[in-house]
Amino acid sequence: MSGSIANTYLFLSVNLRNVKNVILFGETGVGKSSVINLMAGREVAQTSSDLPSCTLHAEEYAFTFPGGTEIRIFNTVGLEEPDMGVKPFMDAIVKAHQLVTSLHRVGGVDLLLFCVRGGRITKTTRRTYQLFYEVLCGSDVPLAVIVTHLEGEENVM
């Protein structure tokens, strides 16, 4: 199949199945993989409190929810500007751009899930938000925020 025919076929097959594409993003160590495991109801994504980052490239997880809605969640590489070094940081940005571009070929991005650590909004947090929401998705995709690490916080509810 030629490239454009294959892309058209993939676009139609994904959209006919009513699949929603969701990108989960945030800094390194905020718990993106734990959110995936919570949604799955079991451990499907590697997590670690010892390693700087478990996710080295965007990983896809497919879920079918009651009612038949299919969701593909892409767990992205965590960004940590000061600690990553310039080359790994730029590589992560290139990978994020490639992910968004490839999803636009098959129906687009339906939702951004921004994972943040409770009580910790840093410059990197703000820049990560700007990169995904404003730059890569043109402020044109619905966004929801997931706040993690609230176990020790008082009066959060």
Name every feature range the model reports, one short phrase each.
Residues 78-84:
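AAA+ P-loop NTPase catalytic core and its hallmark functional loops
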Residues 84-120, 130-144:
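Inter-motif core of Ras-like GTPase G domains
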Residues 13, 19, 23, 29-30, ...:
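Short, low-complexity cationic-aromatic patches
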Residues 22-26, 58, 73, 111-117, ...:
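Short, structured motif recognition centered on aromatic/hydrophobic residues
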Residues 40-72, 95-98:
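Switch I (effector-binding) loop of TRAFAC-class P-loop GTPase G-domains
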Residues 150-157:
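GTPase G-domain guanine-specificity segment
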Residues 20-48:
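Glycine-rich phosphate-binding P-loop
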